[in-house]
């Protein structure tokens, strides 16, 4: 079972929207609440605004309407952040001239964290995602796709974020490696209990990882369903072979089909 909540971070959206220049509406009238320490997946078709939602939560975009609260900050149409946020993108986005450890250290450098503690924090983050001291000295081109994604995850975790945002991080990986990283992510979440928001278009992955699943319509994105996933943690790959798992996947898939109709 997960540990009890260790932080008060949460995310609350009230009628949030995003309209880009030219009038394209990416997200329309979205409302939801995510409590501290929850693991919530957001599923929907490509182009439905899932990534836009994450970027607004991260403060990389400003909503064009509604109220979005992230942590303790509240402002109409503006994202205010309280506490640390980690972001894992679909592409690892590693700096090619830096080693794995140097890439992981970048958020600490930008935060001007004390130099005397950086090395130990980087080593801890790399170890947490299953990378060795030898891996830490390699540049991205010397690492496999799965290892680069582990470095990206370690970089997001090194600041010990209260909120962890993941934008389809495993979408480009093969099924076996994807399952391995799903299990690694679950282990890390159970150990640290950040508020995790995981974007994916893979329903099976969402059911396997999340406590709740928010179903999003095709663009402009609206949330039509908030599905509670009943399975206890820790979850194991064998769960995917059960009838209960298949029924849960079927329920979410049916919601997606109805949302698209």
Name these PLM-found stretches.
Residues 73-89, 98, 110, 115-119, ...:
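ABC ATPase NBD coupling module
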Residues 43-45:
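The feature captures the beta-strand-to-loop junction immediately N-terminal to the Walker
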